[in-house]
Amino acid sequence: MTRSSIQPKTLSPARISVARLAAAASLALALLAAAAPLAAQTPERRPPGAQPPAAGPGEIRGTVVDGQGSTPVGSASIAVRSRADSSLVAGAIAAADGSFRIQGLRPGAYYLRVSMLGYTPQTSATLTVTPAAPAVNAGPIRLARGAVALAGITATGERQAVAIAPDRNTYAARNVAPAATNASEVLEAVPSVQVDADGVVSLRGNENVVVQINGRPSPIRGAQLAAYLKQLPANTLERVEVVPNPSARQDPEGMAGIINIVLKQNVDLGLSGGVTLAASTADRYTASGNLGYQRGPATVFLSYGFTSDDRSTTGINDRTRLALGAPLSFTEQSISGSSGNGGHNFNGSIDYRLSERNVLSSGLLVNLRGSTDASTSLYSELDATRILLDRYQRIRDSQSDNAMVDYTVGFKRTLQPQRHELSAEGRVNRQGDDDRTGLWRQPVGGTSQLDAEIDRTRATTWQLTGQVDYTRGLGAHTKLETGYKGYARWHDRDYTVLADPLGTGSFAPSDLSNTLALDEQVNAVYGVLSGGAGRWELQGGLRAEYAGRQFSLASTGERFPHSYASLFPSGLVSYKLGEQDQLKLSYSRRIRRPGTQELNPFPVFFDLQNVFLGNPELNPEYTDAIELGFQHSARMGSVQLSPFYRRTSDVIRIIINTADSVAGREVTSVSFQNLDTGDSWGADLNGSLRMGQAFSGLAGFNVFKTVTSGGGGESSLSSNAVTWSARVNGTWNVTPRTALTAAYFYRAPMKIERGRFDAFANANVSVRQKLNGDKASLTLRLSDPFNQQRFRIQAGDDNVIQLTERASTSRAVHVTFQYNFGQAPRVRQPRQQDPPPQSGSPFGG
């Protein structure tokens, strides 16, 4: 802190009791105990090249090779499925030379499903085992590299940390952040992704990024999304996909692109599961369990997670009022307090294969969150010579309860994997929020009067989403993707303020109370054509969209309707320079729609002198993004260089007015305004390194320049800034059972309109010890060992300058225990597990 007199102070902390942790741990362990009898009946995962116990005289053998270089692909997963009902019969993992041999098969018709991280899954033709010919040679099975699969990559293993494709980078969660306890900590370790002290996620320095869960946009945003990611257990994440320039098939929201968090959905064999328990010296606790089961046509996955996170916070808000450049008066605000966050997260999914071609899926997500925030701010009013005029305290005590339920049902018909498919999905989401805040002002030996204020916000949001997608191959190397997506959202919020300005104990409704409603509808159709010829891969698409919103204020009767039509073209060209090198060029148009709080013009006070004001006249902002990329992949790792350029119109920017007046108070207001244009360009340099089994690492460097123009003579709102960030993450396997991991991230200072953000840094170091083979592990992690995590911003003009700084408890020791049982999961996504190629109508039975 700038002033050493600030001391941490804890007020009404939301501390977790031993009983709360024991209850959550008991629930996770109960899941384990219930599944233990079944797990005992589930065969263990076999080592590479091994086969299941003999059940018949048949066998299938073959080799897995790279589709372009014919080099062996070791460690690929081979699943043997029945031709009759697609049920899983047996499985194996290819040896280092790509060979496999699966024995003990009864006479019958089968097919193979072969998958490997960084390659497109491959389905074989029908293989028939008969008493007369029990041995079947599947021959070489060629896998196409993910780098030429424009539809994306399916991660099916954990042996590589990163897979590179023209449109996205895919990071295996367990490899990138082996010591992480929640999704937010996993994202901190992903190159090009930043997570600040408040949990806000950004991509290449841009916070306007869409976070998806299993390919679907998260229905929550802002602080609620940050809280949710901190409650999502890390062991439920399979991989993270970073898509900086999505195609027209994807939703166009997110100016910086898309971060897709793929959760574990189901497993390939029998039953598997796990339990995670974690605790830290900083009052942070986690308990979670997951269970997956596959039998015949049905696949079920369940997970539960509990978190509790209590932190102390310190900070300052210093205001200097100026007259002709000379100090006129000072206000010094010292903040100390505590915050607590906790919640429960449940995720369940069921996939049922109706036939060889048709799959019905259903998913349910329930998230319950609660938080507390208690703080005391000490204000000192000083004159120009820094003589004390007045001193008082502002006490803040708030509680928040949030609940979200998300249900999805989908159908998919596959005639040829990724070549001829039809899918439909419906989704309903409901969120409820109840926030309560009390504010008190008390004199400290001065002349100030005592006052009090009680705020309560109750909000309900419903969203209905429908989507239909159709894929059809047009020849051997060309594919057409087309579809429709629409959603409707209804948001109602009641904001009640009761004020006691004289401190008499009599509260009355304030003029700051208001009720608002936001109705929003979006309908879109898209078409994407992709194909290849020789070393070239091409993709072009167009998305047409019509959107409308109506923002209304019940207290004033005002309505702010706004409707607009948009076109979102996209394109991608990639060229393979050789077996290991590739060039790409991509383009897409993106949109950012203003959120509810950004539109709400009624003031919301953080404290006595800081207020939040929305702008109901905001327009959406559009960004045209171009990216050039070079990728080099080799046995020991990969290197990726990606220069990019973004041009944004109607830029939505946070405007900090240090000399505003609201409800008769002199305040610093935070609002939003559309600026004229914004340009940003820069480059990403990311690399991965793998030195056998001893060492693996990731490193990234990002530099970008941002220029905004206020337009209309608002030169004071313009900015011109250059900033950069760097990240390194390495894992050293000291022994086959012990691994040491260290990570460091640094973001340089950055200019904004009327101000400047200071630098931000974060470090983590951990050691992980395997127990009981690979079934269990114990991890010890030290977070922020140098105590560098803090937020600092300076903003102002010729009249007022304000310095704000915040820091919370971040340096801590974490201990995590994980136990897995049953089959080691080879995770697959329902949209990628396809039956063997068939012919026929996509609408047939």
Language-model regions, residue ranges each:
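Outer membrane beta-barrel strand-and-loop segments of large Gram-negative receptors
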Residues: S334, E453-D455, Q463-Q467, F507-L516, ...
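Face-selective signature of the C-terminal outer-membrane beta-barrel domain
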Residues: N345-R369, R394-S552, L641, D679-F704
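Short, acidic, small-residue-rich periplasmic hinge/interaction motif at the N-terminus
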Residues: P43-P52, V65-T71, S77-R81, S115-L117, ...
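Short, acidic Ser/Thr/Gly-rich low-complexity loop/linker segments typical of extracellular
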Residues: R83-S99
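N-terminal periplasmic accessory domains that precede
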Residues: P140-I141, A183-V186, L225-Y228, G254-V275
